[in-house]
Amino acid sequence: KYKLNMILAGVEDAPLVIDELAASEIPVIINPMDNIPDSFDELSSSLELSALLSNAGITVLFDTSRSHNYHLIRQGAGNAVAYGMDYLDAIAGLSTNVANVFGLKDRGSITKGHYADIAIWESDPLEPASIPSYIFINGIESDLTTRSSRLKDRYIKKLDKK
């Protein structure tokens, strides 16, 4: 009737209604590391939730629940893989699923005609210690130099002279 595009966030109790949720085709946003039930509505919290939802055919998007922890989102996706989620489904939870759910169909994947935003990683992007080697935004390489990297380079040179 109202043509709403619904998205559910949290859904720690999703295992209780997994069949109904899958049939509804409503995407969910979860924190894959939120496994401590700290309220009544989170009693079913589990590290396996990401895999359970994804394996049931539910579109999963990841968040960190707190903006100051956003740097942990890749680690959360990695934890989801460690607890049974398919690796490519976890990557999609950070990219393609997000773009599709929010109506950005020309983003989120490496496809001809899409915006050319891409990060090339030195190793597995779901490993917390991994850093991007290159980032391209709209097809243009971004400078990854930071104050920290300049300081590192400066002091490494001083150590090398000794």
Stretches found by the model and what they are:
Residues A22, P27, N31-N35, S39-W121, ...:
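His/Asp/Glu-enriched, well-ordered alpha-helical/loop segment
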Residues K1-M6, V17, I131, I137, ...:
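Polyanionic/metal-chelating signatures
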Residues N5-D13, M33, P37-S39:
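Catalytic beta/alpha-barrel core
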